[in-house]
């Protein structure tokens, strides 16, 4: 038998911390999370883009003439993200099971329900990523096309052009002056299979460790990109992006006043709420883990897609 002896905040914190190691795709993008809402602002949050500054040149002649330097303002844009979806996992805790079978509420209730919630995040991010266009194989500077288009950049099924495709992806992002840090290539299962068959990449393969889902998903590191497999993406789809191309916002709502046990917590870009209460009609407890979710393209110029021939 297990009971609610562990403080709700401790259970919730451990559940949120576990999400970091149970997720891959969400950890490669911009994340914005808070425990609770700021009153009066509704369900749309403004996620900040990186701060930008401008540079200027002061010539030797200007210095000799004592020409004053010019000051500019730092700029920052915000992307509105609507928290449209409530992702949740709700379970019943029948009295007989709760009394004689359950041994650890934290491990057997809180953790599995939190895992169910985090499993939904990559699915929703994948829906967003497939909207990004691919460069044309014949002309990198031409207008973008859908990744399945006959003109789109594609990886050959024999993996013979893996390095050429990665070089093109880097060229496209570099030409757009996208930062070279935090770059990722995420691919569906068919693309991942082709890449892993390439013998030239065998020595560059990244070995997984510590049971970390992001490490487990990493296929290789190529030309400044971390290449990961994401099964929720279309199997013949791949996308190269910098972290701030996409954003994911999570909010853990306030614990209801009627809940006898509960807490919310945000950490490292993830947020969850755990609540439990009693169902008098069934003489049993109930547990819910949830979060309000929203995702958006922050800057489409920081991403480019490709397909599989």
Whereabouts are the PLM-identified features?
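Extended, solvent-exposed, turn-rich assembly/linker loops in the middle of proteins
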Residues: 135-218
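Intrinsically disordered, low-complexity regions enriched in Pro/Ser/Thr/Gly and acidic residues
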Residues: 201, 207-244
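N-terminal "assembly arms/tails" that initiate or stabilize quaternary assembly
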Residues: 1-83, 303
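Long, contiguous amphipathic alpha-helices that act as assembly "spine/axial" helices in icosahedral shell
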Residues: 47, 77-139, 177-189, 279-295
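Extended, compositionally biased alpha-helical segments that mediate assembly or anchoring
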Residues: 3, 266, 271-309
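Short helix/loop capping segments that flank catalytic or ligand/cofactor-binding pockets
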Residues: 55-58, 101, 194-197, 204, ...
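Short alpha-helical segments and helix-capping/turn motifs at coil-helix boundaries
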Residues: 27-34, 170-172, 272-273
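Glycine/small-residue-rich hydrophobic helix-like segments
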Residues: 226-272
């Amino acid at each position: 038998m297990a009971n609610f002896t562990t403080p709700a905040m401790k259970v919730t914190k451990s559940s949120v911390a576990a999400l970091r190691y149970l997720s891959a795709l969400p950890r490669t993008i911009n994340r914005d999370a808070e425990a609770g809402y700021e009153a009066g602002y509704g369900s749309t949050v403004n996620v900040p883009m990186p701060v930008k500054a401008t540079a200027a040149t002061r010539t030797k002649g200007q210095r000799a003439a004592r020409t004053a330097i010019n000051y500019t303002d730092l700029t920052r844009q915000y992307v509105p993200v609507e928290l449209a979806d409530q992702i949740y996992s709700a379970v019943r805790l029948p009295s007989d099971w709760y009394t004689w079978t359950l041994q650890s509420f934290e491990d057997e209730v809180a953790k599995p329900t939190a895992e169910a919630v985090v499993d939904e995040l990559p699915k929703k991010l994948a829906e967003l990523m497939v909207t990004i266009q691919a460069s044309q194989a014949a002309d990198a500077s031409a207008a973008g096309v859908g990744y399945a288009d006959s003109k789109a950049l594609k990886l050959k099924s024999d993996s013979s052009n893996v390095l050429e495709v990665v070089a093109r992806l880097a060229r496209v992002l570099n030409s757009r002056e996208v930062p070279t840090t935090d770059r990722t290539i995420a691919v569906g299962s068919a693309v991942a299979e082709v890449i892993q068959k390439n013998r030239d990449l065998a020595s560059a393969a990244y070995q997984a460790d510590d049971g970390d889902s992001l490490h487990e998903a990493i296929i290789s590191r190529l030309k400044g990109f971390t290449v990961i497999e994401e099964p929720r993406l279309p199997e013949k789809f791949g996308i190269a992006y910098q972290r701030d191309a996409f954003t994911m916002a999570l909010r853990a709502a306030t614990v209801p006043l009627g809940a006898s046990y509960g807490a919310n917590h945000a950490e490292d870009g993830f947020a969850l709420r755990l609540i439990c209460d009693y169902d008098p009609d069934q003489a049993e407890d109930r547990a819910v883990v949830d979060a309000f979710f929203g995702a958006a393209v922050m800057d489409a110029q920081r991403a480019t897609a490709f397909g599989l021939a």
